[in-house]
Amino acid sequence: MPLLVEGRRVRLPQSAGDLVRAHPPLEERARLLRGQSVQQVGPQGLLYVQQRELAVTSPKDGSVCILGSDDATTCHIVVLRHTGNGATCLTHCDGTDTKAEVSLIMSSIKSFSDHTQRGRLEVHLVGGFSDDRQLSQKLTHQLLSEFDRQEDDIHLVTLCVTELNDREENENHFPIIYGIAVNVKTAEIYRASFPDRGPEEELRAARVLTGGPMISIYDAKTEQLRIGPYSWMPFPHVDFWLQQDDKQILENLSTSPLAEPPHFVEHIRSTLMFLKKYPSPTNTLFPGNKALLYKKNEDGLWKEISSGGET
């Protein structure tokens, strides 16, 4: 069955703006979310999700209570939740392969869901803006269409994307919301930023920059964050890119150069330096080709434990 709003089938294709105008509760929810102040989320109990990563857990999790992601410009952050058992998935989609990504989101939630349970699947889409290349608009359409193609009823509860998440300044467009968090125990979704994006922020970013697909990074049964093992080819012309000025990096390595957060170029440079240092990560970063495993300690912070077994 399809994507529903207020129990009614969503008529697609239509723009995000037209969709919320047809459903006042959606419009009001987007307005309230945009109007929030940004909360800075500390590392305790947090699982930070990078671009092209997915994490799913439930209120039974004793380690992770907040899932979050930010730095979404043309990207969208997707939260899918089962209201019966509270299983919650957060992912940061960039349009690389939306069909496969939505399929992964659905299967990750279903791995938790006993469908004899009461409750329903609710989806929240946040991110993007009115960018010149219409990448946000395309991603919004892809996500709505793919959720509409699923067998299950999926209730669209939050839609704050593209033109609904846009502000204009000096004739340039920017997102209003760059990041959100979801409290797994209360289901609250709120605007957020994250000073701590670990563990292994550079390693995870390097995987994305070299074209890695969407992956699930967390095992809620063992409450372990699993990183890798990854492999990539040496990044082409890495020395050339490291010699370029900020403007060149922005214009060539961003989908939306004018709308990126201030730390974007620094983040890209550090990721390129990492790729230069580790052109082939398999044995240098993943001894024995085993995953890096992390678990929350008593203070709610990630701590590395012994490497994983199977690859």
Swiss-Prot record:
EC number: 3.5.1.121
Source superkingdom: Eukaryota
Disulfide bond annotation, renumbered to this chain: none
GO function terms (MF aspect): protein-N-terminal asparagine amidohydrolase activity
Catalytic activity reported: N-terminal L-asparaginyl-[protein] + H2O + H(+) = N-terminal L-aspartyl-[protein] + NH4(+)
Predominant location: cytoplasm
GO biological process annotation, one example: memory
Intracellular or extracellular location(s): Cytoplasm
PANTHER family in alphabetical order: N-TERMINAL ASPARAGINE AMIDOHYDROLASE, PROTEIN N-TERMINAL ASPARAGINE AMIDOHYDROLASE
Subunit structure as annotated in this protein's UniProt entry: Monomer.
Name this protein carries in UniProt: Protein N-terminal asparagine amidohydrolase
Native source species: Sus scrofa
